[in-house]
Amino acid sequence: MNNVFVYLEIEGTTVADVSLELLTKGRKLANQLGCQLEAVAAGNNLAGIEKQVLPFGVDKLHVFDAPGLFPYTSLPHSSVLINLFKEEKPQICLMGATVIGRDLGPRVSSALTSGLTADCTSLEIGNHEDKKEGKVYENLLYQIRPAFGGNIVATIVNPEHRPQMATVREGVMKKEILDADYKGEVINHDVAKYVPETDYVVKVIDRHVEKAKHNLKGAPIVIAGGYGMGSKEGFDMLFELAKELHAEVGASRAAVDAGYADHDRQIGQTGVTVRPKLYIACGISGQIQHIAGMQESGIIISINNDENAPINTIADYVINGTVEEVIPKMIKHYKSHSK
């Protein structure tokens, strides 16, 4: 009752990174609230799944193991969470802002007449004063995300309804094991009690999972281009520089919208979150939604001819100049000094 819950996405028998990241954050939230962290695993052949989950500080793992629960389909997983939450009455539920999370989250929140904030970039605990009603709500979940095209950062609260639900993209939170020997309780539920047979009406006949074309999230060096790159050809310079530095190339939303780069290279609140050791921003102004996806980089270098570009305020080093001037010189330098 009144605990923090995390829904675990599972591919085969492997828990997704985004879910493990949310367990790390959920553990911190539970500590602040003085409650337990619980997780929900729904899939097939899940024996031993607790070995992946409990080390993140999970006090209770709810396991729903049945052939009809993998691959994911909407109705069975919705019934699992809706009926479990009616029993357990969590105060917070977190899930990944993935294809599955974007389908499952709204279904569950609607059925429980709760609210949901999508694509949060930060989650905190705090108080809220409703001056109109003259009420003060303590220990609410601050669901923080950019809004209005990234021009402001909104803090959203859900004072009255439970659970407070939020989705978070992969990479936004850090994944950290709490204790490899953490002792938590594992509960194997009777799936038939929670999921009616009619929920299995949709069956997945075949699946095709494509591998990622690049490793933007895990790259130690990321070179990102913005609208200031001017064209798709401008991005060719970044790929040439990336080849010399053994880096990956990313892009801002403006550059992707302009057709300069593919969407899977987009960095920011509506793209990938990265934490490289070195982040080189080329022709990027630095809207809030972009900064949300790279602000925890080790060293940030901004190449920009606008001294007042917002990204310069968080950059460790600023190179004032056009990308057409600076990047060719960098390429020439690294080519001449590489072995």
Region spans (language model):
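N-terminal glycine-rich FAD/FM-binding segment characteristic of electron-transfer flavoproteins
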Residues: 1-339
